[in-house]
Amino acid sequence: MAKIVQRSEILFRAPTRIGLLADVTERLFAKGVNVLGIRAYEEDGTGVFLIFTDDSRGATEALETLGEGHLGSIPVIAALVPNDPGQLAAISRVLANADINVTQVHATTTDAPTAEVVLTTDDNVRAMEALMQL
C-alpha cells in the first residue's frame, strides 16, 4: 500500500559560481536538514536547485542566510511505495487514466524496502485522490 502526502520542494535560484553547490549543501547541513532528493543544473548563468528535504521550513531558513538568489517552494506529492519493479509505472498509469499531466518527477531509493516518488502535476489535488487507489 502506498502512502501519499502533500509536501513542498524548495526552489532556489542564484547566479552560477564555483562553490555554490557546496555553500547550499553546507547551509542545509549546518541547520540539520536532511536532503532526501536534489536536482541542480545551470540555465543561462543561473544555478537552479530543486531540493526535497525532511524539513522545508528549516531548509528555507538555511538558504535565506546565503543572502543571494531567489527562494521559493513548489507543492509536490510524495508517494512512499514498495521498492518493487513497476511502482513508477503504476503511479504513471493511474495519473494518465485520470487525465492528469505530470510536470516533474524524481524518485529515490536504495536497498530499503520502500522508494519515494516525488512529483508535481497540473492538478495535485486530483492526483492525490487518484493515487489513493494504489
PLM segments and residue spans:
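A conserved regulatory-domain signal marking ACT and ACT-like small-molecule sensing domains
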Residues: 1-134
